[in-house]
Amino acid sequence: MVMRAKKVFVVVAYDVSDDRRRSHVVKILEKVGVRINYSVFECLLTDVQFEKLQNNILGKIKPREDTVVYYPICVDCYTKIVYQPDSRRKYEKVSVV
């Protein structure tokens, strides 16, 4: 029996003032998530991936100038997400961390 790591659905929003730093943040997020708006990504991550994502982004931003916010979404709230228009990818399974 193969055990799979539980995953958490996370919405990541950022405000990065410098084009170069912002480009680095976008490249990191594009590897693990889906862009749903100019500065917002949805990600389905294990705990290890989530921690790594935060560390990778922290290494690319200037905390006094930039902001990145991570919103973990519980299963109950995830099922209530509304997209207008409904064209976004829905993840198959979401687990609470």
PLM-predicted stretches and their roles:
Residues 2-11, 17-97:
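Basic nucleic-acid-binding interfaces
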